[in-house]
Amino acid sequence: MSEENKKQILKVRDFIEKHNIDTIRLGAVDIDGVWRGKQVGAEYFLNKAALDGTQISNILFGWDVADHLVDGLEFTGWDSGYPDIALIPDLSTLSLVPWQEKTASVLCDIQHLNGEPLNLSPRNLLRKAIEKAEQLGYKCYAAYEFEFYLLNDSIASISADQWRSINPVEKSGHCYSMLHHSSSSDIMGEVRKYMRDAGIVLEATNSEHGPGQYEINIKYDDALKAADDAIFVKNGIKEIAAKHGMTATFMAKPSAEWSGSSGHVHMSLSDLAGTPVFANPENPGALSEVGYNFLAGMVALAREMSAIYLPNINSYKRTAGASWAGGNSSWGFDNRTVSHRAITSAGSAARVENRIPGADTNPYLVIAASLLSGLYGIENKLKPKDPILGNAYKVSPELARPLAASLEEAAGIFRESEMARVIFPNEFVEHYAQMKVWEIKQSNSFVNNWELARYLDII
């Protein structure tokens, strides 16, 4: 064991003893952004898992979000016997799980048993994107903001009712209302406190437009930490809500009558010394040349990345019409109708907001796709078109290419995209597209209440 590893293990032991930890959650994120893993005892973690990792079936990348096995995958399946892959703890992610007694969590990287990083792992893909940025002389920073709904009932009671009634904690939406925010102050206060105790800063929380809808803003950090924090916060909110007998949902559009829930991500770069590079000191109302290049790359590849930014059948119900979600490949200064909002500043606050993703996305993949698209713009010195002034929803397709209108269209675009295969490994592109095609087949085979109500009697 190296001296550095010895120091890390000693720090971990001190942390466990200080907080009287007896359970460690070891987990990694799958293709769909679901955090999966194991819970292990503190002694096993210190003496084995922290040193050598642990193993888990590669079925993590062989099933869908509902744990149904996906047919025909090259990576895994019945023919291969679903063998093991390795979970390697990233000890820098060790943190308390304050809402669970004597519990801590560690995020893991995923490797083949021979030590080779797994190309399907979203966290590994983001690591590679960050490495590419560093090779070009940049560090990437990101900040997530999530919207979600708080529902009065537990997930068990909602599912027992066949998902027919979902009752939000508020009967109407009052965006930014201090009165309506106060009605859920206990649970939102717990969320802020628990995240603070876990070392994550929530800069703000507020009520949103939908009934029982809330927004959280996570403080910016380096790109990998930002994605780690986003996963921790999403899971934490769900668990905290469950302790109150409630359900927190990050579904993009849980009801046709309600506002969609976004998962916008803000991106910026610095040089390797930490100096921000998006700001334009000579013209604080504009971006730097590098900032414009990065923005142009994000806009240019937005349509091809639709399957990552809008990964589920339900995602496309959120982006239909004037919905506060980018529906085309567009940009503008401080314009919330575009897909990419440029926010100018004389200093470190200069950034680009990707407004396409919903709260249902995988943060690692969204940040990786956004970063790699931006780096493509920098490498090729792309120039953005003129900014959209006013309502981007009314702009013609000639001026702003529409994003994919359905998951079926998005999966096809992603699979056929040459650029997707330039910025991501071929293995990932094929696997991801196949998973989305599977999801479409599952949806198409289901008879829903709308069909029954429309056709059962009259046809």
From Swiss-Prot:
Q: Which SMART domains match?
A: Gln-synt_C
Q: Which reaction does it catalyse?
A: isopropylamine + L-glutamate + ATP = gamma-L-glutamyl-isopropylamide + ADP + phosphate + H(+)
Q: Which keywords appear in this protein's UniProt record, sorted alphabetically?
A: ATP-binding, Ligase, Nucleotide-binding
Q: What Pfam family is a match, any one? A: Gln-synt_C
Q: Where is the GS beta-grasp domain?
A: 19-115
Give start and end of each GS catalytic domain.
Answer: 122-459
Query: Is Nucleotide-binding set as a keyword in this record?
Result: yes
Q: Which Gene3D superfamilies match?
A: Glutamine synthetase, N-terminal domain, Glutamine synthetase/guanido kinase, catalytic domain
**What is this protein identified as?**
Glutamate--isopropylamine ligase
